[in-house]
Amino acid sequence: VEEYYEFLINKFEKYKKIKIHNFGLLDKTFETKISKLGAGSSIFTRSEGVAEQKIFIKAATEFIKEEKLTEIDLLYMNIEGSEYQLLANLIESNEIMKIKHLQVQFHNYVDNSKIKRKEIRKQLNKTHKCIFNFPFIWERWDRRK
């Protein structure tokens, strides 16, 4: 969302090591619309009378390769239902191994969210250790040594 992007550019302008990108990450590259609901903005939820904006989504695996990322210290993920697609893709591509610390909020309004979360947690447990788990609130995972 354009105004969130501008806000972050201004907030982090002093920090030269921080790069802000005006796109989201998922399992594939495409354009879509997002509902503008502040912290609850989502490509999954639509409400009558709520403003929407066209946004660009880039495949996370493509972004990791383009940026030549070999290690990601922290992936903080509160992406309003898109976490299932993104994590499944990172696990399947083995890019998950580049992530040292993962903090994720799973959302339960997505179809089959309990089943999807259970499967992702099972896969994550092979590469990462769960540090804390408050189901559908917050979870923290650290890469196994």
Question: Where is each model-derived feature located?
Answer:
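Phosphate/nucleotide-binding beta-alpha loop and adjacent structural elements of enzyme active sites
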Residues: V1-K145
